[in-house]
């Protein structure tokens, strides 16, 4: 299955690259007067968060708003790197990147800089020096993890036997959301029942939780690094007749705040959901327009304001205001 997904994402990247065509560098598309932009993102099918994120960028980076934008998608670093290098070769004015992995971008960023292509980060940070990109409009993934784990500690459970479902390994979201929980495992305050990547997938998460249930290993917390994996975990619990949510056998924690996930909190089927804002496009747009007018970004790093939601206090107004999708 993983091989098929890799092939599919490779096809998506290749299709996007071939669709880009020849573009000219230096203040916009010479024939149309539009600013040329290459957007590299995870595929919308990855999660409800990513669907909202992709929709946000496609709504902002339009011809009507002064852009000739091309999009490439993959959750695989090597495939994103191919797309990045092709955008540089094609001479776009800007590359906007939500990186699949934090490491390995330095040389590509330097090549873009030499070619006069400006790079913006969105959603996720990378480990490259900040001098190699214009600015980053991102979530503080480490703080998301700390907020979630602090909430969990405040529940004062008699014991913490945790199934930890990680996102794609090496991504900023995975690293940040894992770090705070790892600190608790390392201190002995919480017990690691299993810690395994579910690759943001409900199906993979369901299989992991099912294997723990089949083994008869006791657990009372599922910490899933996105909503889709939490949903898959809950499906495994339901199939086995294990109760979950407020006052039940297993505490359920997710991230992203899809509307359907917040409704699960409201119904007290889940316990916690951490917000991760997908709306960075308008901020990046404003920075690009400033650069086009000779004004450098005022800030190198802009962090989205985010919070966590508790099933005992969430309201319908919270769902309406903060929930993603329908």
List each model region and its residues.
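Short, solvent-exposed amphipathic alpha-helices that sit
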Residues: 48-63, 67, 144-148, 172-190, ...
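Flexible loop/hinge segments that line or gate small-molecule binding clefts
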Residues: 104-143, 161, 258-266
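Short beta-strand elements at the ligand-binding edges of bilobed clamshell
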Residues: 70-73, 128-151, 165-166, 195, ...
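Hinge/cleft segment of the Venus flytrap/periplasmic-binding protein
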Residues: 22, 33-35, 165, 169, ...
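Hydrophobic alpha-helical
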Residues: 81, 85-89, 97-114, 181, ...
């Amino acid at each position: 299955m993983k091989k098929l997904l890799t092939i599919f994402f490779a096809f998506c990247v290749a299709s996007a690259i071939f669709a880009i065509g020849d573009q000219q560098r230096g203040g916009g598309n010479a024939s149309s007067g539009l600013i040329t932009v290459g957007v590299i993102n995870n595929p919308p099918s990855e999660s409800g968060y990513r669907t909202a994120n992709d929709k946000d960028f496609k709504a902002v980076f339009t011809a009507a708003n002064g852009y000739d934008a091309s999009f490439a998608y993959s959750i695989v670093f090597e495939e994103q790197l191919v797309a990045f290098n092709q955008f540089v070769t094609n001479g776009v004015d800007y590359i906007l990147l939500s990186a699949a992995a934090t490491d390995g971008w330095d040389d590509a960023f330097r090549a873009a800089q030499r070619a006069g292509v400006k790079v913006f980060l969105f959603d996720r940070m990378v480990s490259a020096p900040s001098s190699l990109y214009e600015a980053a409009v991102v979530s503080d993934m480490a703080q998301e993890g700390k907020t979630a784990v602090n909430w969990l500690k405040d529940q004062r459970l008699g014991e913490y036997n945790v199934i930890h479902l990680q996102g794609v390994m090496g991504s900023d979201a995975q690293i940040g959301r894992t770090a705070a929980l790892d600190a608790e495992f390392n201190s002995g305050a919480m017990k690691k029942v299993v810690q395994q990547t579910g690759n943001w997938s409900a199906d993979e998460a369901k299989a992991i939780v099912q294997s723990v249930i089949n083994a008869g290993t006791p657990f009372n917390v599922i910490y899933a690094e996105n909503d889709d994996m939490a949903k898959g975990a809950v499906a495994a619990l339901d199939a086995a007749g294990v109760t979950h949510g407020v006052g039940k056998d297993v505490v359920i924690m997710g991230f992203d705040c899809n509307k359907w996930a917040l409704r699960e909190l409201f119904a007290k089927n889940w316990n916690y959901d951490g917000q991760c804002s997908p709306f960075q496009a308008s901020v990046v747009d404003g920075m690009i327009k400033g650069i086009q007018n000779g004004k450098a970004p005022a800030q190198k790093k802009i962090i989205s304001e985010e919070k966590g939601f508790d099933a005992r206090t969430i309201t319908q107004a919270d769902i309406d205001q903060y929930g993603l999708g329908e």
